[in-house]
């Protein structure tokens, strides 16, 4: 079984997570979703089996939804996080505008 480095490593701990620990764990979960997307898409792009490709792509898309859910939760728990992501989006929007 893979070790994902979660706060509890698959077992309930004898204490609850602090809010800071929860926020860090959710960031990790976002990263894990992106890693899963990458693995599923690499596998889908590496086969000519249409069924496997379709199923893997569908699963990858579900992981994108999960990432969005975790991000929304993260924004609620750590409002500064959303502000920083928004700042990054605006910086790239400026670059895109400069290309036009």
Predicted regions mapped to residue ranges:
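Iron-associated oxidoreductase/ferritin-like identity signal
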Residues: 1-100
């Amino acid at each position: 079984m893979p070790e994902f480095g979660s706060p509890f490593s698959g077992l309930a701990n004898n204490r609850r997570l602090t809010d800071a620990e929860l926020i860090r764990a959710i960031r990790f979960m976002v990263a894990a979703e992106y890693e899963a997307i990458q693995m599923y898409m690499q596998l889908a792009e590496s086969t000519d089996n249409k069924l496997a490709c379709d199923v893997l792509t569908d699963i990858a898309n579900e992981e994108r939804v999960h990432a969005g859910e975790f991000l929304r939760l993260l924004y609620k728990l750590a409002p500064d996080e959303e502000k920083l992501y928004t700042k990054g989006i605006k910086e790239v929007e400026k670059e895109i505008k400069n290309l036009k």
